[in-house]
């Protein structure tokens, strides 16, 4: 075994199984690239990203941990979001929520 190595069972592992997801079309209206990490509360991302925000409250990108999605200036793409699990307490980020979600 190598330090830090993870040995999993044979077969596929389904990420975020059973959690609610939504599809959102996002456009970068800014003049600089914007990168969003896997566990950032999507509702609170950079204001230069244009999309319908309210449905994204309590959601994050449905991508593997430690990865990110990059939006170049003028880019428009569809992303899948997944509900944040655990205690569903959202604090920090851009301080738009700072409370436990319902």
Curated annotation (Swiss-Prot):
Q: What is this protein called?
A: Urease subunit beta
Which pathway, metabolic or otherwise, does it act in? Nitrogen metabolism; urea degradation; CO(2) and NH(3) from urea (urease route): step 1/1
Q: Which SUPFAM superfamilies match?
A: Urease, beta-subunit (SSF51278)
- Identify the enzyme class: hydrolase
Subunit record text: Heterotrimer of UreA (gamma), UreB (beta) and UreC (alpha) subunits. Three heterotrimers associate to form the active enzyme.
Q: Which organism is it from?
A: Trichodesmium erythraeum (strain IMS101)
State the UniProt keywords alphabetically: Cytoplasm, Hydrolase
Q: MF terms per GO, please?
A: urease activity
Major location (coarse) = cytoplasm
Catalytic activity as recorded in UniProt: urea + 2 H2O + H(+) = hydrogencarbonate + 2 NH4(+)
Q: Which domain of life is it from?
A: Bacteria
According to its UniProt record, the EC number is: 3.5.1.5
Task: Give Gene Ontology CC terms.
Answer: urease complex
The UniProt similarity line reads: Belongs to the urease beta subunit family.
Which InterPro entries does the annotation name?
Answer: Urease_beta-like, Urease_betasu_sf, Urease_subunit
According to its UniProt entry, one GO biological process term is: urea catabolic process
Q: Where in the cell is it found?
A: Cytoplasm
